[in-house]
Swiss-Prot record:
The modification Phosphothreonine is found at T185, T267, T354, T809, T846, T848, T854, T861, T868. The lineage of its organism: Eukaryota, Metazoa, Chordata, Craniata, Vertebrata. Its main location: membrane. GO terms for biological process: actin cytoskeleton organization; actomyosin structure organization; adherens junction maintenance; ameloblast differentiation; bicellular tight junction assembly; blastocyst formation; cell-cell adhesion; cell-cell junction organization. It comes from Rattus norvegicus (Rat). Residues 325-338, 1442-1468, 1509-1519 have a biased composition (Polar residues). This is Tight junction protein ZO-1. Disulfide bonds: none annotated.
Length: 1765
């Protein structure tokens, strides 16, 4: 480069360039970090030169690097590490890792005059020209710009002031020239200290550059080129911009008077234009930068510190420093740069605009200027605004980190365009300014129309002009609404001065691309949409605002909800800032909830009389809604935490958790000591935690463990410390007592109070939670989950405030001004206010909450406050939680805590890139809180406990990566159904986990496997722990929460699936609070909690609303939300609503599976999932805090509830209700045994839920719309399948109700198995599943899944799904499950759930241990199901063993049938054989796959269910798509759970499985059905049968390993396979397709539906002619609940593939049409598969689609690779 530069220079200036090397040591400064931005890198070469150097792209004014580094300096080394040919991210990382000091070696280009003694008068300009060229590249590369700038910047810097003013390159040069008569000389001034001054006063003059021939001036002869213009028409021109000068001349009205001074030396004329332009650009850019910095400096600074990493992920343009801007709000900086530059460079228009944008784009502002200059010369075209959104860096973060990011480059280009034609217009305002504005902060404010005859029109303003400044107010970074209001607010008659620039082409592009505003906001109040186009939201949700003047009117903003993975989910209308502030003020003024919070508030006031009362009030306050200091809308950007974020733990064992972390991991965690408050403060035991204390801990590279109140958390968020807030969700009061007795026997805190406080905390402050972990009192799996959650949160991106917090956090928090925190400035020092609970809490009592909450601090009396405070002490304000709305704000809580505005979501989900979207976090947070709140409302203490219990189960199951989420979700799910149900679930889960897998194991599992494991464990544990006891006890614990709900809403429960109702009831109780959200919180909290964890993992599901499905969904997603929210909103009656008014679990799951938020919707499902922790749902929770999990949880709850219920009733999940509330359970059972199967299938759906959560885009769309789109897409894809589907469409509910025998024929292993398998391959979106009353033992087994085995299997299989599928459900089981499914297909999944419960009945360890092979092969396990399903169904509360058996057989059957479809289900299904026992006739020896299933039915089945449900569910969680799709599908579908079995497995499975199936045939599997349930709405992808098929295959291998021969055989298609399903209730066959294929392959498609199966050559063994069929069904019982009145429909069809058990040597591609989203990448898809022939929801397993090589989501269809049916 130096050579090139030298050449250029010598060519132009007789000078050469040399590289000087300098080494500087930078000290990280609080607000600035190192104060530099870097660009370039191997992966981000200069867009023109291709240079890959790391270049200083920006040096912050007043920052540590000012005076030491310059723009365009090339970074040679950082702390001794070479920066040559490294990637941008690496360079950023090195800077970030450098701690407080960084030793940076740079190369700086220096121009040397060869011929002339002067260093480089001309050469300087030349060089600069060269540099400028580089800069030009830079705008895009970001690196080049940096590099160029640095060379010239040092030069330009010295003269930056003058340059800024110098409007044109000449004037700038001229000042230089004037100082040097001969030629320009390069002068470099380096400050030795920051406050040192250059001592220059610069000015710019306008000179005559050229006189055209034959012009007036030429003829006059008095003006010569090079003359300096001193006056124009009497106006002094010094420091006047060229634009202003031009305007003056244009306004001369035919007579131009000028005063000029002759420059004999013509110095200005001799200054090279290019070089000069660059210089001036640099200088002005510099100035612009400073101005911009002032605007966005904070962000910029912060970004500099931390952004490098971020920017890296973001986009090359963002560069580390730029990333700062961009993360912060690149738009803003860019605008700022633009406007300041333009102002400064009025004389040189080109430089003005570009620098600004460039600055945004590239950290270095100078570069931008240069770029502008060059662009101006080279191409005046403005980059299209659109590119801004699609910047290189953005891919990492789904959303553009900040609109400005994209804009910057545009700005640069625009500058080039704008520069030449600036105009200064002055006029007096009449009645109006007479302008119509377009654009926004992302692209600039443009004149869209000028009123004729208005002063503005007369002065020359016209359409297409960009307004750069009005009355000295910069318009470059202003949102359109502000611009309009500013103009409107100008007093009539006041003189208006508008600096504009003609940019007609840019304007045209802006109008065509419909861009304008683009910035991110986090909400800090709850809002219910007021119109169908509105978006409802909870606290902590993040939106991208794209139009602040929607429809050209003030009052509404067009915003896009940001969901999981920071993806844009749905767009709609939200109130504008002013209205939002009004609404928020009302919310904070009035009591949030109808009774509880307000009553509590007054109660606290009354209690203050005594110390005890004070303590109590403090405790209560901790749970009170936080009154935040945040504005209603907080501008946020996505950033990485550049420091170890403080950790706040809330929950009944928060004190134990803090001490355990600090004791066992002293080098990672340290408890922040509290200091006494000022004198007289009190009684409160603890004082406050000083921010300084926190900072000291952070400086030691440790997480500060804070014992603070939720208010303190909010304040920390406000101060931008963005603590990681983990909520340990208790399973029950008894669970809390048990855990505390075990963990801290000396503690005197009251378990009841701790539990109640936790419940309230979750209800009111869930939005503060970044993660929720469900506690299982049976084990300590929560600990591993806690550590994993903290690690994940730390690694996630965080939504942080765009600017510094206004004012330091007051109170006792002593925070420094650098409240930006490292998040804002990675290198910045933290300033934290004391986050001490007392200190931060709104109330004094709350303030000491941390202390009070601590066990030690409180006695029994104080127990309450003590226990709760830890939970409530710090709630993740950043985490969006539905609950929040309900009890979010209490009058009590005077001062708003620092809501983790910036980081709710991000923090919550560690796995997310940096952090979840606010909405995600909200979802996570809200899920926990809602969970609590539902419990709280119905039975605040009981409910909370229940939920907590669920959490525990989840925790145990999958503590590590997804434990917090999974735990939370599971717990939530469990809790939601009913206070006790959650309890039960937790226990089951706890039992299962400890006995079978140590929490650590579970934790360390892959996210999906973990989840599955967790679920497995959960299921198993309960069963293992105490089958009978569990049921009896669980019904109470698990059902307790439900019972309260059920009791309160017995009728409702009856209407809805019990678990669902429990959730609903939960919510209902809450519903007393006017806010449906509250309601939702009550029940959704669980779901949300679960979801929130999932959200953590999946950015998309972050939607708080989604999480709070009932309420938020409604407002948020009109179509889906309507249905979801419809029932969810009134949790009292929600359950029935979602379920097509079916009380059955199946229906319920569906409801909970609502497209919008599958998991949230079906609170029951979430609960179900957790409750039936043995079920896939349980795994789903762990699987991650994905939306699926959410869903899963609810269904789980449902399912889990059933375990207790099943105890009381074998027939349905309803038994859960029965257990908790017998009547509801019974109605459910009575309603439809089939439903139970459905419920079971939903268990797999929980994973789907997670996915759904993940796919917020789905939610925004109405289900109907999605369905239509899906169908359209489907039509092409599923043509062939359709025929088969019609014939084979299965009806899980029907199947369930029907005797499995009818469906499955034991004697017919192959044909029926095939069919069964095919049916099993039912790919359907997960839907809540009703846990079936099946033997807990069976359930346990079904849930039982060796997490390790499962995980390993997955790896072997290319996808965990495959492995899990195999392990969790053998083919034999699948058929059984299938048949059972007709009778009770859901059983399979339900079984897993029940497995939890049953596992209580039988040792969890046993189930877990045998999870894969044992389970599969465990005849005993299979045997428990033997009791006839019908009898089971009929039995309201059969003995545990009986129930267990019943469920088992049913579940096994159903699961076996749908294995292919839902891998998770597959696993569960595999256990189908047990159900087959109950129906030997039904079970027929399955084909290859069936035998394994049959073989393992007893144990295998539960194991399978567990594995599938848990691990696969987790996987399924990935898709955000589920969120929008009907919950059921999503919950069941695992995005990638497709259990794609590697060919080896297929080979073994094909023949062997068939053989094995006959073995299993001892327990005839129900007719296998593979359900490919693609919901039209959200989960078509997840439904991919391919996934299910793989699942089957995968499962088989596990089971099959022991008894499968590999000889290939054609799998017979049972005649009933194609027809049977139709008979089942709830199955409506839309289309069927069948054909005979050989090794040559082919395509089987259904034209009507667009479903197709593409069989590759070699998929079928040589010499075999295999009949293959599929049925496209609409299953009313199996599918997730949809609100048909609201037009909700499934996005994808439900596809049952057959013959069941058929394995392929090569995966076949199942294509399901869908139109869930406008853009394929905007949605996440949840795929469900089931090995159950009936496709009962219980057997549905979530398939993890996202990222799975076996699945592809296209615009119109979802492709899933399936290796078996």
């Amino acid at each position: 480069m130096s050579a090139r530069a030298a050449a250029a220079k010598s060519t132009a200036m007789e000078e050469t360039a040399i590289w000087e090397q300098h080494t500087v040591t930078l000290h990280r400064a609080p607000g600035f970090g190192f104060g530099i931005a870097i660009s370039g890198g191997r992966d981000n070469p200069h867009f023109q030169s291709g240079e890959t150097s790391i270049v200083i792209s920006d040096v912050l004014k007043g920052g540590p690097a000012e005076g030491q580094l310059q723009e365009n300096d090339r970074v040679a080394m950082v702390n001794g590490v070479s920066m040559d040919n490294v990637e941008h991210a690496f360079a950023v990382q090195q800077l970030r890792k450098s701690g407080k000091n960084a030793k940076i070696t740079i190369r700086r280009k220096k121009k040397v005059q060869i011929p002339v003694s002067h260093p480089d008068p001309d050469p300087v300009s030349d060089n600069e020209d060269d540099s400028y060229d580089e800069d030009v590249h830079d705008p895009r590369s970001g690196r080049g710009a940096l590099a160029n700038r640095r060379g010239e910047k040092s030069w330009a810097r010295d003269r930056s002031a003058s340059r800024d003013r110098s409007l044109s390159p000449r004037s700038d040069r001229r000042s230089v020239a004037s100082s040097q008569p001969a030629k320009p000389t390069k002068v470099t001034l380096v400050k030795s200290r920051k406050n040192e001054e250059y001592g220059l006063r610069l000015a710019s003059h306008i000179f005559v550059k050229e006189i055209s021939q034959d012009s007036l001036a030429a003829r006059d002869g008095n003006i010569q080129e090079g003359d300096v213009v001193l006056k124009i028409n009497g106006t002094v021109t010094e420091n006047m911009s060229l634009t202003d000068a031009k305007t003056l001349i244009e306004r001369s009205k035919g007579k131009l008077k000028m005063v000029v001074q002759r420059d004999e030396r013509a110095t200005l004329l001799n200054v090279p234009d290019l070089s000069d332009s660059i210089h001036s650009a640099n200088a002005s850019e510099r100035d612009d930068i400073s101005e911009i910095q002032s605007l966005a400096s904070d962000h910029s600074v912060r970004s500099h510190d931390r952004p490098p990493r971020r920017s890296q992920s973001r986009s090359p343009d963002q560069r580390s420093e730029p990333s700062d801007h961009s993360t912060q709000s690149p738009q803003q900086p860019s605008n700022g740069s633009l406007r300041s530059r333009e102002e400064e460079r009025m004389s040189k228009p080109g430089a003005v605009s570009t620098p600004v944008k460039h600055v945004d784009d590239h950290t270095p502002k100078a570069v931008e200027e240069v770029t502008v200059e060059k662009h101006e010369k080279q191409t005046p075209t403005l980059p299209e605004p659109k590119p801004v959104y699609a910047q290189v860096g953005q891919p990492d973060v789904d959303l553009p980190v900040s609109p400005s990011d994209g804009v910057l480059p545009n700005s640069t280009h625009e500058d080039g365009i704008l520069r030449p034609s600036m105009k200064l217009v002055k006029f007096r305002k009449g009645d109006s300014v007479g302008l119509r504005l377009a654009g926004g902060n992302d692209v600039g404010i443009f004149v869209a129309g000028v009123l004729e005859d208005s002063p503005a029109a007369k002065e020359g303003l016209e359409e297409g002009d960009q307004i750069l400044r009005v009355n000295n107010v910069d318009f470059t970074n202003i949102i359109r609404e502000e611009a309009v209001l500013f103009l409107l607010d100008l007093p009539k008659g006041e003189e208006v001065t508008i600096l504009a620039q003609k940019k007609k082409d840019v304007y045209r592009r802006i109008v065509e691309s419909d861009v304008g505003d683009s910035f991110y906001i986090r909400t800090h109040f709850e809002y219910e949409k007021e119109s169908p186009y509105g978006l409802s939201f909870n606290k902590g949700e993040v939106f991208r605002v794209v139009d602040t003047l929607y429809n050209g009117k003030l009052g509404s903003w067009l915003a896009i909800r940001i969901g999981k993975n920071h993806k844009e989910v749905e767009r709609g209308i939200v109130p504008n800032k002013n209205r939002a502030e009004q609404l928020a003020s009302v919310q904070y003024t009035l009591p949030k909830t109808a009774g509880g919070d307000r009553a509590d508030f007054w109660r606290f006031r009354g209690l203050r009389s005594s110390k005890r009362n004070l303590r109590k009030s403090r405790e209560d306050l901790s749970a009170q809604p936080v009154q935040t200091k945040f504005p209603a809308y907080e501008r946020v950007v996505l950033r990485e935490a550049g420091f170890l974020r403080p950790v706040t733990i809330f929950g009944p064992i928060a004190d134990v958790a803090r001490e355990k972390l600090a004791r066992e991991e002293p080098d990672i965690y340290q408890i922040a000591k509290s200091e006494p408050r000022d004198a007289g403060t009190d009684h409160r035991s603890s004082g406050i935690i000083r921010l300084h204390t926190i900072k000291q801990i952070i400086d030691q590279d440790k997480h500060a463990l804070l014992d603070v109140t939720p208010n303190a958390v909010d304040r920390l968020n406000y101060a931008q410390w963005y603590p990681i807030v983990v909520f340990l969700n208790p399973d029950s009061k008894q669970g809390v007592k048990t855990m505390r007795m075990r963990l801290c026997p000396e503690s005197r805190k009251s378990a009841r109070k701790l539990y109640e406080r936790s419940h309230k905390l979750r209800k009111n402050n869930h939005h503060l939670f970044t993660t929720t972990i469900n506690l299982n009192s049976m084990n300590d799996g929560w600990y591993g989950a806690l550590k994993e959650a903290i690690q994940q949160q730390q690694n996630q991106l965080v939504w942080v405030s765009e600017g510094k917090a206004d004012g330091a956090t007051s109170d006792d928090l002593d925070l420094h001004d650098d409240r930006l925190s490292y998040l804002s400035a990675p290198g910045s020092e933290y300033s934290m206010y004391s986050t001490d609970s007392r200190h931060t809490s709104d109330y004094e009592d709350t303030d000491t909450e941390g202390g009070a909450y601590t066990d030690q601090e409180l006695d029994e009396t104080l127990n309450d406050e003590v226990g709760t405070p830890p939970e409530s002490a710090i709630t993740r304000s950043s985490e969006p939680v539905r609950e929040d709305s309900s009890g979010m704000h209490h009058e009590n809580q005077t001062y708003p805590p620092y809501s983790p505005q910036a980081q709710p979501q991000a923090i919550h989900r560690i796995d997310s890139p940096g952090l979840k979207t606010a909405s995600q976090q909200k979802a996570e947070a809200s899920s926990p809180v809602p969970y609590l709140s539902p419990e709280t409302n119905p039975a605040s203490s009981a409910s909370a406990v229940k939920h907590n219990v669920n959490l525990t189960n989840v925790n145990l199951e999958e503590p590590t990566p997804a434990p917090p989420t999974s735990h939370v979700s599971q717990a939530d799910c469990l809790g939601a159904p009913s206070p006790e149900a959650p309890h039960t679930m937790l226990r089951d889960e706890g039992v299962s986990l400890p006995s079978h897998v140590d929490p650590a194991k579970v934790y360390r599992k892959e996210p999906y496997p973990e989840e599955m494991m967790r679920q497995n464990h959960i299921l198993k544990q309960p069963a293992l722990g105490h089958p009978g006891q569990r049921l009896d006890k669980e019904p109470n614990p698990a059902y307790d929460p439900q019972l309260p709900y059920v009791e309160k809403q017995a009728s409702r429960d009856l209407e809805q699936p019990p678990y669902r109702y429990e959730s609903s009831s939960y919510t209902d109780q809450f519903s007393r609070n006017y806010d449906h959200r509250l309601r939702f919180e009550d029940r959704v909290p669980t779901y949300e909690d679960q979801w929130s964890y999932y959200d953590d993992k999946q950015p998309y599901p972050t939607r708080p609303f989604d999480t709070q499905h009932p309420r938020d969904l409604d407002s948020r997603q009109h179509p889906e939300e309507a249905s979801e929210r419809g029932y969810f909103q009134r949790f009292e009656e929600p359950a029935p609503l979602p379920y097509d008014s079916r009380p059955r679990y199946e229906q319920l799951p569906r409801t909970s599976t609502l497209r919008h938020e599958e998991q949230p919707t079906s609170g029951y499902e979430v609960h179900n999932r957790y409750r039936p922790e043995a079920q896939p749902y349980a795994p789903a929770g762990p699987k991650s805090s994905e939306p699926k999990q959410y869903f899963d949880q609810y269904p789980r709850s449902y399912e889990q509830v059933p375990p207790p219920g099943f105890t009381s009733k074998t027939g349905h999940y309803e038994p859960l209700h029965g257990a908790a509330v017998v009547p509801p359970l019974i109605p459910s059972s009575q309603h439809k045994p089939e439903v139970l199967p459905s419920a079971t299938k939903p268990q797999p759906p929980p994973p789907a839920l997670t996915e759904e959560e993940e796919d917020p885009a789905m939610k925004p769309q109405s289900v109907l719309t999605r369905v239509k789109m899906f169908e359209n897409k489907r039509s092409a894809s599923l043509e062939n399948k359709k025929d088969v589907n019609d014939t084979a469409s299965f009806k899980p509910p029907e199947v369930a109700s029907k005797p499995p025998s009818a469906s499955l024929v034991g004697p017919k292993p192959v044909s029926q198995t095939q069919f069964s398998e095919h049916d099993k391959t039912l790919y359907r979106l997960p839907e809540p599943q009703k846990p079936q009353a099946k033997p807990p033992e069976d359930i346990v087994r079904s849930n039982h899944y060796d997490p390790e085995e499962d995980e390993e299997y997955y790896r072997k299989q290319l996808s965990y799904f495959d492995r899990r599928s195999f392990e969790s459900k053998p083919p034999a089981h699948i058929p059984a499950g299938h048949h059972s499914e007709p009778a009770k297909p859901v059983h399979s999944q339900s079984q897993p759930n029940f497995s939890s419960y049953s596992s209580k009945g039988k040792p969890e360890t046993d189930a877990m241990d045998r999870s894969f092979s044992e389970k599969r092969y465990d005849p005993t396990q299979a045997m428990p199901p033997p009791p006839p399903l019908p009898s089971q169904y009929s039995q309201p509360v059969p003995p545990l063993s009986n129930s267990s058996l019943h469920i088992h057989s049913k579940a096994a059957q159903s699961e076996g049938n749908s294995v292919s479809l839902d891998f998770q289900n597959s696993y569960i299904s595999k256990p189908d054989p047990p159900p087959s026992q109950s129906k030997p006739a039904t079970f027929r020896p399955p084909t290859r796959e069936d035998p394994p299933q049959t073989f393992y039915p007893q144990k295998s089945f539960p194991d399978k269910a567990s594995v599938n449900g848990a691990e696969q569910t987790q996987k399924t969680i990935t898709p955000a798509y589920n969120r929008f799709t009907p919950k059921p599908y999503t919950s069941s579908a695992r995005p990638f759970e497709r259990k794609f079995e590697s060919p080896k497995f297929n080979h073994n499975l094909l023949p062997s499985e068939t053989v094995h199936k006959p073995e299993l045939s001892s327990k005839p599997p129900p007719s296998p059905k593979t359900l490919m349930k693609a919901h039209s709405s959200t989960q078509p992808p997840e439904f991919d049968s391919g996934v299910e098929t793989f699942s089957v295959h995968t499962d088989k291998p596990k089971y099959q390993i022991n008894n499968i021969s590999t000889m290939p055989k054609a799998v017979p298609v049972s005649p009933s396979a194609v027809e049977e399903d139709e008979d089942e209730d709830g199955h409506t066959v839309v289309a069927t397709a069948r054909g005979i294929f050989n090794s040559n392959g082919g395509v089987l498609s259904s034209i009507e539906t667009g479903v197709s199966i593409i069989i590759p050559q070699g998929a079928i063994p040589e010499g075999i002619e295999q009949e293959i069929y599929f049925k496209v069904c609409r299953d009313n019982s199996i599918l997730p609940p949809l609100d048909k009145e609201k037009g909700e429909t499934l996005l994808s069809p439900l596809v049952m593939c057959g013959p069941h058990g058929l394995k392929f040597l090569k995966p076949v591609e199942l294509r399901l049409p869908h139109c869930a989203s406008m853009t394929p990448d905007g949605w996440s898809f949840a795929l469900k598969s089931s090995d159950s022939s009936s496709g009962d929801p219980k057997t549905w397993q979530n398939k993890c689609l996202p990222g799975d090589p076996n699945y592809l989501v296209g615009a119109n269809c979802v492709s899933v690779l399936i290796d078996h049916f």
